Amino acid sequence: MRKSFLFLADGFEEVEALGVVDVLRRGTIEVKTVSISDKKEVTGAHGVPVVADLLLSDVEEEEAEFLICPGGMPGAKNLGDCTALVQMIQKHFDKGGYVAAICAAPALVLSKIKMNKRYTMTCYPGFEEYLPEAEMQPHGVVVDGNVITGKGPAYAFKFGLAILEQLTSKKVAEEVAAGMLLD
C-alpha cells in the first residue's frame, strides 16, 4: 500500500499538521509524519513538541501517494529551505503525484517547484506574491488536479478531508466529517 507523508520542520502549525494526520488516520489512510531534520522531535510554532514517525532520510518517494506540507512560521520557511524535500516534491510532482500544502506552505514550498501549468491555489493572506504563476482564489481549500492547497488553520480539517476524498471517496470523507461533527 502506498503511503502519505506529512513533513514537519521546527515552527510548523500544530493544527494544520496534526489535524490533517488525524483526519487521514480516521479515514484509515497510512500517513507518516516526517521530520526534515536529523532528529525526530520537532517543535511546533506554539511550543508543542511532536515526535515524528520518520526522518526525511527514511522516506522513499516511490512509496508516496501524497506529500503534504503544513504551514506555520517559521515551519513553512524551513520546509521550503530544505533542498532534499523540495527535490523530492519536484520528483513526485513530475510523475503526476499528489502534493498538498496549507497556509504559508503553498507560497514558501510549492513556489519552489516547477509546475507544468497555471494551477488554481489558495494560501495564507499576504503570501500570494510568492505565487505569481498561480491563479489565486480566496477559498479555504482549493483542489486543482493533483494539487490541493489550504488557506490556514481554520481550514485544517477541510483540507484534510479534501486529501482524504482524493485518496478514497467522497463517501468516506463525508463519513469521517460526520464522525467529527463537521458540517
Residue ranges and their predicted role:
Residues F12-E16, E41:
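Short N-terminal binding/cap micro-motifs at the start of the first secondary-structure element
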Residues L18, S35-D38:
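Short glycine/proline-centered loop/turn elements that form peptide/ligand docking sites
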Residues K39-H46:
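Membrane-interfacial amphipathic helices and adjacent loop/beta segments
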Residues V21:
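Histidine-anchored nucleotide/phosphate-binding helix
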Residues H46-L54:
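Short gly/ser/thr-rich secondary-structure transition/capping motifs
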Residues R2-L6, F12, G27-S35, D53-L55, ...:
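Active-site-adjacent pocket-lining segments in enzyme domains
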